[in-house]
From Swiss-Prot:
InterPro entries named in the record: Foamy_env
Gene Ontology cellular-component annotations: host cell endoplasmic reticulum membrane; membrane; viral envelope; virion membrane
Keyword Transmembrane assigned: yes
Other information: Foamy viruses are distinct from other retroviruses in many respects. Their protease is active as an uncleaved Pro-Pol protein. Mature particles do not include the usual processed retroviral structural protein (MA, CA and NC), but instead contain two large Gag proteins. Their functional nucleic acid appears to be either RNA or dsDNA (up to 20% of extracellular particles), because they probably proceed either to an early (before integration) or late reverse transcription (after assembly). Foamy viruses have the ability to retrotranspose intracellularly with high efficiency.
Protein name, entry field: Envelope glycoprotein gp130
Subunit structure: The mature envelope protein consists of a trimer of SU-TM heterodimers. The N-terminus of leader peptide specifically interacts with Gag protein. This specific interaction between Gag protein and Env glycoprotein may allow particle egress.
Signal peptide: none
Gene: env
Species name: Feline foamy virus
Lumenal side: 87-953
Superkingdom of origin: Viruses
Positions of the record's site feature: Cleavage: 127-128, 563-564
Pfam families xrefs: Foamy_virus_ENV
Post-translational modification: Envelope glycoproteins are synthesized as an inactive precursor that is processed by host furin or a furin-like protease to yield a functional hetero-oligomeric complex. A 9 kDa protein corresponding to the N-terminus of the leader peptide may arise through low efficient cleavage by host signal peptidase.
Length: 982
C-alpha cells in the first residue's frame, strides 16, 4: 500500500492559496481570476493563525490519524457516560441501604386443611373396594420470636461453693473373724482380696496436696469482695444538705414527649423530671405540689434534702482507668484489693482510706488514686452520685433570667456577642430554651378544664436542645453558676477492708450478716443508683460465734455402739492419715473449707474411720458362716461399684453433721447427697496372711452446696426467621441473652449460665437472671443475619409427634419464611418428606412453651444482599433508629461494595436485582449491561472495566494528561519529519 503524503508548510500554503482562489471564483463567477501555477515563496514570518491552521491539518492529514482521533473521542465519551450512570446507581445504592425494610412478626398461629392420600376408609360395592379420599388436617402453630422451648428434665444448680473432705476406710478381716467366723477364715480373706484387687487395678494412686491452696484469709477476701467489693462510706464531718429543691441541668436530654421517637438511651435523671401538668384543678398551685421546683427541671430526691452525716454507695462507675471492667472478676478483685491496700491508712484494722483516693475536686490533696473526677454529664446518668459527693453545685441553664441574661440584653453574653441571625444559622442559636413570663397562672375554660401556665415555658418537644448546646453545636447563652455547698474535707472508708478485718476475728458469716443489714439494699441496685445519704452512721457491732463441739460420747447417743478398733488398726490409721491431716483441699474448683463452722465437721469426718465390716456385724450374727461371707461379699461389691462410679455410699457414712453444720433443709440435703462425688486416690493392702487381710481405701469427697435450685426449666432452640429480598435469601435471628427459661410459681425467669457441668444435674458456677427481648421490655437485643443458599429447609421431629419446620418455600399450606410447629392427623408428604401423625391423635393448639414478650422487628431492606456480598454476619438491632445509626457508621464500608469488591459484571447484576422493585427500567438496563459484559465480552473486557471502575475518580485526569503528552509528541514528530524532508 502506498504511504499517504503529508504536505510541508510551503506545499500546504500553495495548496491553500489555490483553494482560496478557487473558492473566490466559485463564489463570484462574474469575476475573472487567473490562478497561477506557482505561488510566491513562503514569507520568513508566517502568521500565528496560519501556523495553527497548518498544525490542525497535520493532526488530521492521513486517514490513520483520523481513525485514531475518532476512537479517542469514542473512548472519552464512553468513560464519561459510564461514570455518569455509575454515579446515579451509586446514589440509588446509598438510598437503598438506608431504606426501611420489612417488619418481621413471629406472633402467628393458624390452621390449614389440605387433601392427602388415600386412607383406610372404604366401602364395598359388589367385589370392588372403593377408597375415599379423606382430608388430612395440618395444624400449624407459630413460634413467638422464633424460639422453640423444649423441656429440660435436669434441674439447674447455681453453685455457691464446693466442700472438700478426705477419709480412710479400713477393711480388716480380723474384726469379723473374732467371735463370728471361726472355720472359713481363708474363704473370707479370699473374698475380700478378690474385690479389693479389682478396685486397686482401676485406681490411679496420687497424693492430695497438703493444706488448702485457698487459705482462710484468701477465702474471706473473696467472699467480702463478691459482696462489698465496691462499697464505701463517706463521712461528711458535719450535717450536709443539698441547698436547692431542683436541678437546672440542661445538658441532659429530656425524656421523649409528644410521641417523639427515642433518640437517646434512657438516662437515670429522667425519673426526677417534672413535666408540665396536662390538666389541673382551679385551686392548684405549683408551690403546694412541687415547692420551689421549676416546671421543666429535675427534682432533688427528698433524702438529699435532709441532714446527713455520712454517705454510702456501692458502685464501680466512678473508678478511674486503673479498674479493668472487661476482665474476669478474679482479675478485678486482685486490682481492687491492690489499689485499696495502697490507700489504706496504716492504722491496724481500720477501714479508713487516705485522701489520695479522691480526685482534686473532692480533696485538696487528692490524686485520683481510686476515683475519677465527676464531669458535667455524670449528672445525667448518675444524679445520686453527684448529689452525694459533690462539694459544689454547678448549674447549666438556658433559662431566661438566669445570670441576668434576658431577650433584650442577650448580646452581652460572650457566646452571642455581635450575633446577627441569618438563614444559615442554627435555629437554636442564641436563643433561650425556657422563656420567662411575668407571672404564672391557672386559667380555666370551665370547672373541669383548667390548664397551668408556668412562669417559664419553652419548646419541650425539642428535648435535645440543651444537649446540643452543651456539645457546642451552636452558640448559646449558657448560664453556668457555681454554688459552694460544702467546705469540710471528707473521710472515706472501704467496706471491703472492714469486712476482711472483722471477719478474721468474728467470722465471715457474722460479719456478712451484720453488714447486709446496712448495705444489703445497695448491692442489688444498679451502679448508677446505689448512692444514699445516711444520718449518724455507725459500723455494726459483731459477736463472736462460739459453738461448742460435741464430744464423741454425745455423738454416740441414740446410735448403736461400734466395737473398738484394735491398737494395731489405730496405728495403721494414724500412719495412713498422717498425710491427710491437712488434706482438706480443692481438687477441682473448691472455694472454701476454711469456714470456722465447717471445720468441726471436717475433722469429725476425717477422724471418723469407717470400719466397713463392723457396720454389718449386727446383721450377720444370726446367719451361718457361709451366708455371712456372702452377705459381706455383696456389701463389698456394692462399695466397689459405687466407688468406681465416683459416688458416695451414704449407707455407711453419717451425714447428719453435714446438714447440721450447713443449716440446710432436707430437700437441699437430698441434692447434696445426689451431687456429691467420691474420688478414690489410693487402695493398698496393709496385711496379707492366709487367714487375715487388711485393706485401706483413701477417698476424697466433693460436696457441692447450691445457692439456688431451678427445677421447672425449658431449653431454647433459636430458629430465627427467613428473609428474601433483592433476590437473595438470608436468615435473621435474635441473639437471646439467655439459654434457659425457668418457671417457678408461674413466673418466667430468663437464665444465662456460665461454666456449667452436666452431671446428674446441671451445675453452674454463674447463673444470672436477665430481662427478655421484646418491644415492651426495654431490652434492645442484637439481631444477626447470615446469607443462605437459594433453597432452605429445616425439619426436626419433636418428641410429642409434631414437627418443627422452617422453609423458604411453601407446601401443604405450610407458610414460608416463618418457623412453625406442624401436627397432622394422618400421613402426608410435604417437602418430599413424610409427616406422620402422633401416637395420640390430637390436633388442638397446644401450648408447647411459655409465652415470651411481643416482638416486632424491622430489618434493613437490603439485609439479604449485604449479607450475600460480604459473606459474613451483620449485626442489626430490634429498633429501626439503631439500625440507621449502625448503617450510617458502616456507610463507607457498604458503599465500598459497589466497585471495590469482586468482579464488575457481577456487581452490576447484584445492583440490578437490588433496584428491581424501586427502579424497574434502570434495573433491567443495568442487568443487561452486566450480562453483556459477563457473557458476551468475556472475562478480559470485564476485568478491564472492573479496573477502570476501581480507578474511576482519577481516570479522567490521567486521560487528559495522556492526551496532552500525545499531542506534544505528535507535533514534535511532525516537525522532525518536515526537517528531514527539507
Amino acid at each position: 500500500m502506498e504511504q499517504e503524503h503529508v504536505m510541508t508548510l510551503k506545499e500546504w500554503m500553495e495548496w491553500n492559496a489555490h483553494k482560496q482562489l478557487q473558492k473566490l471564483q466559485s463564489t463570484h463567477p462574474e469575476l475573472h481570476v487567473d490562478i497561477p501555477e506557482d505561488i510566491p515563496l513562503v514569507p520568513e514570518k508566517v502568521p500565528l493563525k496560519m501556523r495553527m491552521r497548518y498544525r490542525c491539518y497535520t493532526l488530521c492529514a492521513t486517514s490513520t490519524r483520523i481513525m485514531f482521533w475518532i476512537l479517542f473521542f469514542l473512548l472519552c465519551f464512553s468513560i464519561v457516560t459510564l461514570s455518569t450512570i455509575i454515579s446515579i446507581l451509586r446514589y440509588q445504592w446509598k438510598e437503598a441501604i438506608t431504606h426501611p425494610g420489612p417488619v418481621l412478626s413471629w406472633q402467628v398461629t393458624n390452621s390449614h386443611v389440605t387433601m392427602g392420600g388415600n386412607t383406610s376408609s372404604s366401602s364395598r360395592r359388589r367385589r370392588d373396594i372403593q377408597y375415599h379420599k379423606l382430608p388430612v388436617e395440618v395444624n400449624i402453630s407459630g413460634i413467638p420470636q422464633g424460639l422453640f422451648f423444649a423441656p429440660q428434665p435436669k434441674p439447674i444448680f447455681h453453685k455457691e461453693r464446693t466442700l472438700g473432705l478426705s477419709q480412710v476406710i479400713l477393711i480388716d478381716s480380723d474384726t469379723i473373724t473374732q467371735g463370728h467366723i471361726k472355720q472359713q477364715k481363708a474363704y473370707l480373706v479370699s473374698t475380700i482380696n478378690e474385690e479389693m484387687e479389682q478396685l486397686q487395678k482401676t485406681v490411679l494412686p496420687f497424693d492430695l496436696p497438703i493444706k488448702d491452696p485457698l487459705t482462710q484469709k484468701e477465702y474471706i477476701e473473696k467472699r467480702c469482695f463478691q459482696k462489698y467489693g465496691h462499697c464505701y462510706v463517706i463521712a461528711f464531718n458535719g450535717n450536709k444538705v443539698w441547698p436547692s429543691q431542683d436541678l437546672i441541668q440542661d445538658q441532659c436530654p429530656l425524656p421523649p414527649r409528644f410521641g417523639n421517637n427515642l433518640k437517646y438511651r434512657n438516662h437515670t435523671i429522667w425519673k426526677y423530671y417534672i413535666p408540665l401538668p396536662f390538666k389541673v384543678s382551679s385551686n392548684w398551685t405549683r408551690v403546694e405540689s412541687y415547692g420551689n421546683i421549676r416546671i421543666g427541671s429535675f427534682k432533688v430526691p427528698d433524702e438529699f434534702r435532709q441532714n446527713a452525716t455520712h454517705g454510702i454507695f456501692c458502685s464501680d462507675a466512678l473508678y478511674s482507668n486503673w479498674y479493668p471492667r472487661d476482665l474476669p472478676s478474679s482479675v478485678q478483685q486482685s486490682f481492687a484489693q491492690a489499689y485499696i491496700t495502697k490507700v489504706l491508712m496504716k492504722r491496724k484494722k481500720q477501714p479508713t482510706l487516705r485522701d489520695i483516693a479522691f480526685p482534686k475536686e473532692l480533696s485538696p490533696v487528692g490524686s485520683g488514686m481510686l476515683f475519677r473526677p465527676i464531669n458535667p454529664y455524670d449528672i445525667c446518668n448518675m444524679p445520686r452520685a453527684v448529689l452525694l459527693l459533690n462539694k459544689t453545685y454547678y448549674t447549666f441553664s438556658l433559662w431566661e433570667g438566669d445570670c441576668g441574661y434576658y431577650q433584650h440584653n442577650l448580646t452581652l453574653h460572650p457566646a452571642c456577642k455581635n450575633f446577627n441571625r441569618t438563614r444559615q444559622d442554627h435555629p437554636y442559636a442564641c436563643r433561650f430554651w425556657r422563656n420567662k413570663y411575668d407571672s404564672e397562672s391557672v386559667q380555666c375554660y370551665n370547672n373541669d378544664m383548667c390548664y397551668y401556665r408556668p412562669l417559664y415555658d419553652g419548646t419541650e418537644n425539642t428535648e435535645d436542645w440543651g444537649w446540643l448546646a452543651y456539645t457546642d453545636s451552636f452558640p448559646s447563652p449558657i448560664c453556668i453558676e457555681e454554688k459552694r455547698i460544702w467546705k469540710k474535707n471528707y473521710t472515706l472508708s472501704s467496706v471491703l477492708a472492714e469486712c476482711v478485718n472483722q471477719a478474721m476475728e468474728y467470722g465471715i458469716d457474722e460479719v456478712l450478716s451484720k453488714l447486709d443489714l446496712i448495705f444489703g439494699n445497695l448491692t442489688h441496685q444498679s451502679a448508677d443508683e446505689a448512692f444514699i445519704p445516711v444520718n449518724n452512721f455507725t459500723w455494726p457491732r459483731y459477736e463472736k460465734q462460739n459453738k461448742q463441739q460435741k464430744t464423741s460420747c454425745e455423738r454416740k447417743k441414740g446410735r448403736r455402739q461400734r466395737r473398738s478398733v484394735s491398737t494395731e488398726n489405730l496405728r495403721r490409721i494414724q500412719e495412713a492419715g498422717l498425710g491427710l491431716a491437712n488434706a482438706i483441699t480443692t481438687v477441682a474448683k473448691i472455694s472454701d473449707l476454711n469456714d470456722q463452722k465447717l471445720a468441726k465437721g471436717v475433722h469429725l469426718l476425717r477422724d471418723h474411720v469407717v470400719t466397713l465390716m463392723e457396720a454389718n456385724l449386727d446383721d450377720i450374727v444370726s446367719l451361718g458362716e457361709g451366708i455371712q461371707i456372702e452377705h459381706i461379699h455383696n456389701h463389698l461389691t456394692s462399695l466397689k461399684l459405687l466407688t468406681l462410679e465416683n459416688r458416695i455410699d451414704w449407707r455407711f457414712i453419717n451425714d447428719s453433721w453435714i446438714q447440721e453444720e450447713l443449716g440446710v433443709s432436707d430437700n437441699i440435703m437430698k441434692v447434696i447427697r445426689k451431687t456429691a462425688r467420691c474420688i478414690p486416690y489410693n487402695v493398698k493392702q496393709t496385711r496379707n496372711l492366709n487367714t487375715s487381710t487388711a485393706w485401706e481405701i483413701y477417698l476424697y469427697y466433693e460436696i457441692i452446696i447450691p445457692t439456688t435450685i431451678y427445677t421447672q426449666n425449658w431449653n431454647i432452640k433459636n430458629l430465627g426467621h427467613l428473609v428474601r429480598n433483592a433476590g437473595y435469601l438470608s436468615k435473621v435471628w435474635i441473639q437471646q441473652p439467655f439459654e434457659v427459661l425457668n418457671q417457678e410459681c408461674g413466673t418466667n425467669i430468663y437464665l444465662h449460665m456460665e461454666e456449667c457441668v452436666d452431671q446428674d444435674y446441671i451445675i453452674c458456677e454463674e447463673v444470672m437472671e436477665l430481662p427478655p427481648c421484646g418491644n415492651g421490655t426495654g431490652s434492645d437485643c442484637p439481631v444477626l443475619t447470615k446469607p443462605l443458599t437459594d433453597e432452605y429447609l429445616e425439619i426436626e421431629p419433636l418428641k410429642n409427634g409434631s414437627y418443627l419446620v422452617l422453609s423458604s418455600t411453601t407446601d401443604c399450606g405450610i407458610p414460608a419464611y416463618v418457623p412453625v410447629v406442624i401436627t397432622v392427623n394422618d400421613t402426608i408428604s410435604c417437602f418430599d418428606k413424610e409427616f406422620k401423625r402422633p401416637l395420640k391423635q390430637e390436633l388442638k393448639v397446644t401450648k408447647y412453651a411459655p409465652s415470651v414478650p411481643q416482638l416486632e422487628l424491622r430489618v434493613p431492606r437490603l439485609t439479604s444482599l449485604i449479607a450475600k456480598i460480604k459473606g459474613i454476619q451483620i449485626e442489626i438491632t430490634s429498633s429501626w433508629e439503631t439500625i440507621k445509626e449502625q448503617v450510617a457508621r458502616a456507610k463507607a464500608e457498604l458503599l465500598r461494595l459497589d466497585l471495590h469488591e469482586g468482579d464488575y459484571p457481577e456487581w452490576l447484576q447484584l445492583l440490578g436485582e437490588a433496584t428491581k422493585d424501586v427502579w424497574p427500567t434502570i434495573s433491567n438496563f443495568v442487568s443487561g449491561i452486566g450480562n453483556f459484559i459477563k457473557d458476551t465480552a468475556g472475562g478480559i473486557f470485564g476485568t478491564a472495566f472492573s479496573f477502570l471502575g476501581y480507578v474511576k475518580p482519577v481516570l479522567l485526569g490521567f486521560v487528559i494528561i495522556f492526551c496532552i503528552i500525545l499531542i506534544i509528541k505528535i507535533i514534535g514528530w511532525l516537525q522532525n519529519t518536515r526537517k528531514k524532508d527539507q
